[in-house]
A protein has these predicted regions:
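Structured alpha-helical
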Residues: 1-222
Length: 222
């Protein structure tokens, strides 16, 4: 079977998930990163550490419904990343249990045709929001769900679409700070007095260190 026919049979999809990885047959603390694309037979990963070609890995992909564990081999590795960026790696899957294979197929079927499908995970944490460019005090709220692309904010006041915020989430690894924009807010007619108001928030400026903290948070390591 040619490489082209394999690619056509098992396409890759731009599904973005937090991923933990460890060396196969070696007890060590896991590394962390993100998927850049994902298919039934392999993936492109953005990792904090450079991993050499031929290295066997055990991967744990965190989704909004389950963890998918896969054994894989590194088939190519990009140049060692700068401190403010990760390093891309191509991996080929070598072993996956039937129930995890089914979970992977279900994920690809549900998310595969969504452009830049960042899976949102339900995480409720306290968040402080500062309105960039306005000399006002911070607004305290709660997160509802989080992905690499953004999060759901629950705030005591309604902020208009397009509002630029700097958000800070406290984690056990330290504060996670990022800038972004409000892209939607619950209509005023749906506001319940005394209840927080939901806002969609898209990240626009997140440093690599914060992205790693975010990956660890979503992967259950914080």
């Amino acid at each position: 079977m040619t490489q082209w026919s394999v690619q056509r049979r098992f396409p890759r999809f731009p599904i973005i998930l937090p991923v933990l990885h460890r060396l196969k047959d070696r007890a060590a603390a896991p590394g962390v990163g993100w998927t850049r694309n994902l298919g039934e037979t392999g993936a492109c990963l953005e990792l904090a550490e450079w991993v050499g070609t031929g290295t066997g890995l055990v991967l744990c992909l965190r989704t909004d419904t389950t963890d998918i564990e896969i054994e894989a081999t590194v088939v190519w590795a990009g140049e060692r990343g700068r401190r403010e960026a990760g390093t891309l790696h191509g991996v080929s899957f070598t072993r996956i249990a039937p129930d995890h294979h089914k979970a992977l197929r279900d994920l690809l079927r549900q998310k595969g045709h969504v452009r830049q499908a960042g899976v949102r995970l339900p995480v409720e944490l306290t968040v402080l929001c500062r309105n960039v460019g306005h000399d006002t005090g911070p607004i305290q709220g709660r997160t509802g769900d989080i992905s690499r692309a953004g999060l759901l904010l629950r705030l005591p006041v309604a902020l208009p679409n397009g509002t630029t915020l700097e958000v800070t989430i406290q984690t056990s690894h330290g504060p996670l700070t990022a800038k972004g924009t409000v892209i939607w807010v619950d209509p005023s007619g749906q506001h319940v007095p005394g209840e927080p108001i939901r806002h969609g928030f898209r990240f626009t400026d997140v440093g690599w260190a914060s992205e790693l903290t975010l990956a660890m948070l979503l992967a259950g390591q914080l």
